Amino acid sequence: MLGDGECGKTNLLRLVARGLADRFSTEELVFAVMDPRRGLRDAVPEGHLGGYAGNGKVCGGLAAGIAKELDKRMPEAVADSQALADGGWFHGPRIVVLVDDYDMLTAAGQQPLAPFLPYVPSARDIGLHFVVARRVAGAARALYDPFLQALRESGTSGLVMAGDRGEGQLFPGVYAGGQPPGRGRWVRRGEPTRLVQTAIAEPTPERVGS
């Protein structure tokens, strides 16, 4: 998810979190939230929240801890040949990693999500999912950092929201540009690019009136 300030990235992350938490139980799904601006601090219900990190150092530790669990889910760590044949070789909840302001986490060459790199190619099979947001400014170069490049190579979908067209091509044939908040171009491999408008995440009860 790419977009500059006030385009609706954080709102959409909150919307995704709420929708998944409403749909899946705490036994089925857990979130890891990486949130340097604290815009998602109350986005995930407590029962679904497996970990929260507000800076690059803590994010790196959280990612490393999750990686230990993911290692147990990899096919070579499973002895049951029938489970391998069926594709059901992991137990436990699906893990959704929500990342806002990825550009802030990777400032000064930091790579706090590097522990996930060995698992991105197998993410779908081991119950690992990423929703990552960063600004458009600097994205043309940043999309080739190891983690984002791994996501792109795995066939991840993308949403290009408001930003400077001068940043260049962000996905094949897709450039940022002026857009109202919440609007962007949805990019998915093998499908035509679509213009979409995202919804507004209503405030959680504890935030109403605050």
Model segments located where?
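Phosphate-binding and hydrolysis-coupling loops of NTP-dependent motor/remodeling domains
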Residues: 12, 133, 140-210
